[in-house]
Curated annotation (Swiss-Prot):
Its cofactor is (R)-lipoate. The keyword Phosphoprotein does not apply. InterPro entries: 2-oxoA_DH_lipoyl-BS, Biotin_lipoyl, GCV_H, GCV_H/Fam206, GCV_H_sub, Single_hybrid_motif. The gene is gcvH. It comes from Prochlorococcus marinus (strain MIT 9301). Residues 24-106 form the Lipoyl-binding domain. PROSITE patterns: BIOTINYL_LIPOYL, LIPOYL. One of its GO terms (cellular component) is glycine cleavage complex. The modification N6-lipoyllysine is found at residue 65. One of its GO terms (biological process) is glycine decarboxylation via glycine cleavage system. It holds the Pfam family GCV_H. PANTHER family: GLYCINE CLEAVAGE SYSTEM H PROTEIN (PTHR11715), GLYCINE CLEAVAGE SYSTEM H PROTEIN-RELATED (PTHR11715:SF3). This is Glycine cleavage system H protein. The keyword NADP does not apply. Belongs to the GcvH family.
Amino acid sequence: MSYKFPDNLNYADTHEYVLEENGLLKIGVSEFAIDQLGDIVFVELADEGATLEKGETFGTIESVKAVEEVYLPFSGEIVSVNESVIENPELLQSDPIGDGWLVILKPESKASIADLMTSEEYQSKVVPK
């Protein structure tokens, strides 16, 4: 399978992607990681308004193969939760970077996206040459 690695995304070591928009961070899970999980059957996310620290779990994704936790790459307040993904977990497989985003975070302080991997760096980490 060929994966998409859009240039406007940055990635954490734990496979979450971050898209910065107007000072807010849209966070989801990479297409590569979702593909590794197989068929997604259940998604649970933290509540809107929750304030969490960098590295804390903000949800779980359950597939036929495994249950994986998802982690915040930055501290902040969750200002929006994608209810569509909770109701239709298959959105994570069909469109993980588009409609399959998980949460929108208002970072505690100016988020340093530079601390994350670029799309190119992430791609070289997960896709064998």
